Amino acid sequence: MSGSGSGSCSYFIFEKAKNTNIDSEDENNKIITIDSNKQNVYILPYNNLDYYKNYGLFEKGLIEWSKQFCSSDKNMLDIGAHSGTYSISLAHLCNKVYAFEPQQMTYYSLCGSVALSNIQNINCIKYGLGSETQIGIQTLNIISDDGGGSTLHCNTSTANNSNVLKTETIEVKTLDRFNITNISFIKMDVEDNEFNVLLGSLNTLKNSNYPKILFESNTYNEKLFNFLKALNYNVITINGVNNMFLASTN
């Protein structure tokens, strides 16, 4: 699959299987296949092909570690789902997964990955999440061909005006407006917008008894950490993983 326009990205299909030896590669169609006993299928950015071939999915150790926070009778939120590696890998352990991804091409790869994996309990949602003051149409700054690092903010640790490849208009809502309940686990990767997402999620967090939150923070965000502390969350660093934290009330 190929994107179009300035700063576009080509994609390939990655079939995750028990045997991780690559049997075939089709450069023309940008597809790699990993034996016929496939389990999950991911449409992933082609510029990261060498990494996927050599090491597998990004953050696969974190994905495996996150399984302990999923429950078959509870829901998971994947906020900043990208191509769905967390959602698809964890869906079988959850009642339902709500995967939020506002960037157009990345959202398409997410939906395609879910469809090719034939997973029925993932709801792909093309909205950005934020605070009440961010509701409406916002500008998403895209700083990478693979869709990673896209942010609503410039002049931050993630993006500045000089490294923005292009922009895209997206619609932002608060998480509370979706009225999702019975949540056990939230994975959040929203590139410096974590505080605003949580501001718009207070009722959701309360109604689900403050689920565990795995999140990325590229800099020490005192406002974010103090906000979580005020909600009685304890925040711990993830050993061996840069900039990743777990917020938990127990």
Predicted regions mapped to residue ranges:
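Phosphate/nucleotide-binding beta-alpha loop and adjacent structural elements of enzyme active sites
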Residues: G3-N250
